Amino acid sequence: MSVNFKGNPVDLKGNVLEVGAKAPKVSLKAKDLSVVEIAKEDKVQIVLTVPSLDTPVCASEAREFNQKIAAFKGAEVIVVSMDLPFAMGRFCSTENIDNLVVASDFVAKEFGEKYGVLIANGALEGLLARAVFVIKDGKIAYKELVKEITEMPNFEAVEEFFKGSGSCCGGCGCH
């Protein structure tokens, strides 16, 4: 699988998980170095992957989801990158990001590898491609892999999913 960075193809390590697949459990580091668990069976999680919060597009994406989080009632929104937890904390403080969780995959790159979004070559090698996963009941309920890393994900599609057209089957306020 590949995506583009500024129009040039870059490969991803592994296979991107598809809707219906079991979501692998992964432990990441929060900005305060606590553990963030991905694929909790008792929560609906919206997981956004970005190369780095220190880039304009990634920062805009985090701000946008931070503002629109009310549309995803009952869901936990988590932004995952390879940024160091300290840098993530500084970003959240500077940008007043307080409605979502930031988590780093820098320790083992386990999320990137298991979810198929780890960039394997090119200028961004070792970072994460831009993607959105909704995890419900331990499975991938929604997925968007953004084909051009420098572009934003489709916010409207995620909102529509939670309004019921893609329906996450309840428990998250989408009905």
Language-model region placement:
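Chalcogenol-based redox active-site neighborhoods
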Residues: M1-H175
